[in-house]
Amino acid sequence: MFGKTALVNALVSAVSAGTILWDGRFNEMSSSADLEKWSWANQVGNYQYYIHGSGAVSKYVNLSPSYKNQGDTGSKQGAKITIDSTAKWNSDMWRTELIPQTKAAINKGTVFYHFSIKHGTTNVPSATNEHQICFFESHFTELKYGWVNGESGTSNTNLQWMVGGQSKWKVELKADEWHNVVYEINFSSNQVTFWHSTGNNTLVRTAGPFSSSTSSNGADWHLGVLRLPRQGNDGTGAEDWFFSGTYIESGTLTTSVVSPTA
């Protein structure tokens, strides 16, 4: 029965799949140490790895089959991305981020940025700090978690989708619940749309389209987390964030959690 189910899932994924422009699913990596093969002088692999703390790569990024969304049979493993008090890069912000290494046109026409995200029950993220997640440098669209500047109160456990700094969708982020996300970005018409599901459920259009200044040079989307400091309300201790099924496609949107064959 398992074999039949896997075959059906594969066929469904194949039928619905678009064209993968960039594959960031970690399928070809043996460990996170492979990230250190990349440098500005030697731009190899699928990720640029330079936004992190001073520790070893294993302090900030680790890979394992147990870190992926188990509903995604197209991904061999997922990533645990950690931020802590040592994860500072050119500021007092806590940051561990990976950037696509590609010459593909991931900033042209209509493209779909896929990823799944969760946190666990260990090293739980601080709800009193603003987290910018899977963002573009111009912040025309991104996720946020925790208390966001301008909100009332001192904490917020919602995961929010933002467009130009404005919240367009939110849900409580519970431990060990996968949130599957697609940013549908039309760089030609300057619009963004949000697709979402949980667990192994099919993605559905959830919010948008909204007009936005969709500016990107093709090397400024950050997979990972940036945490802003907040005097008097800073959380303490490391935070673990999990990412799975990361890729960018064009053409027909893959709405299945089962990511397609590259």
Regions found by a protein language model. Give the residues of each.
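Low-complexity, Ser/Thr/Pro/Gly-rich disordered linker/stalk regions
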Residues: 17-173, 187-188, 204-262
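Localized edge beta-strand/strand-to-loop motifs within extracellular or lumenal beta-rich domains
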Residues: 174-193, 199
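Short polybasic amphipathic segments
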Residues: 158-160, 193-196
